[in-house]
Amino acid sequence: MNDNQTLNEINYKLSFFWIKKIIILLLRFFGIILDNFYKKDFYFCGDNNLESYFFGYHDKKPFNNDDTKIIFHSYKNLKSLENQSKKKVSINLINLKKRKLLILDNTKAWSWQLGSSLQWHPNKDIVFFNKKVNKRYITRKIDLNSNKTKDLNFSIYNISPKGDKFLIADFVKLGMLRKGYGFKKKKSQMVFLNKKSKLEIIINKNNKRKTLHLFDETKKKDVLGSYINHQTFSPNGKKIGYFYTLLKKNNQRQIFFYHFCLNKKKNYLVNISKSKLISHYCWRNNDEILITMKENEKRYLYIIYNTETKKIKTLNSKLNKDGHPMFNPKNKDLFVSDTYPNLFGLQKLFIFSLKQNKVIWKRYIYSPYKFRGILRCDLHPRWSNDGKKIFIDFIKNANRNIGIFKTSV
């Protein structure tokens, strides 16, 4: 191949790149026009254009136990979102009745998708989040009634329904192997990517760390590293669902979904299909899990998997896009979910009824093109504890924001 051929190929690829980008931007511009026709009946929405607001992942609730307060992150807007990921974010609280914002603290231990694992105690006005103190990652606990603060010697992922146990995560490892989900470290502080991953739990009574299950891939030469992510308790706190991922040398990720039974002290692989990729999940009850699963390159499935009987039920075929589901805490017939932006940049937020086998409520939210990849802003819908409101992260005026919808379904 001569130099002219090489140059022609480069010019062709560059031309194709710009043509593709222009088409995408034109479609997104049309999406902005469409967005103006869709209903935006927010009960609450952040209104400070100088700051960006967001909560985090869809497996936690920003509402306190009686739904009178919400917690979320904020940061002052910068031109470069990449620069923001190196800075602190504020931990905030709003009283929904008074609409008054209170800054509780700040943290550098956060990521775009998970935030700082900010969450409430299930029954008390106590807030937990990850924080970096004296070069160590810890969990900060703030009791809003007593104004007392306590630092716990672990990084929290999720708290149990009774508030007596914590699931913890290796966020530094996540930050290296799953960008956008973990904590960043300087190159000089990079830790060795070992091939061992632990499912760990903290018992609240004595803060004792316990390993529930150990994965060891050290003998597998084609494995570069491994990590555990998205650990959640079943409603009664007796089971734990989670993803275990292998990073292969061919830059491929092999993802497995497990549930661990605390009573039996056993780990179970959810072996639905070797060819279908499980992407997101939520607990419906103590035995059933709602799963979004990739069927092929263009289509996803929503299925309900029973951890006891191993039976699978596939939902309405029109639910063919990936999303982040959560069941209504008061009505297990209903779940809320979302979609990723389509060609026009529109994300769909919807409520699905299992009994009616259809979508019974929906809204469309526009997402600008610059919020993609690691920097994307998924809606990550979450119910309030009374099952009457839905909280989302979204983009408003080119900034991250939070919004709450009231529903009457």
Specify the residue positions occupied by each region the protein language model found.
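Conserved blade-ending motifs and adjacent loop-strand segments that build the rim/top face
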Residues: 277, 316-326, 358-382
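Short, conserved, GDST-rich strand-edge loop motifs in beta-rich repeat architectures
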Residues: 17, 73-87, 169-197, 242-254, ...
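Surface-exposed loop and turn segments in beta-propeller and other repeat-based domains
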Residues: 43-52, 104-111, 209-224, 361-373
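Structural motif
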Residues: 81-91, 135-140, 176-178, 195-200, ...
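Loop/turn-rich, solvent-exposed surfaces of beta-rich toroidal or solenoidal domains
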Residues: 299, 316-356
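Asp-box/WD-like beta-propeller blade repeats and closely related beta-sheet repeat scaffolds
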Residues: 106-198, 213-223
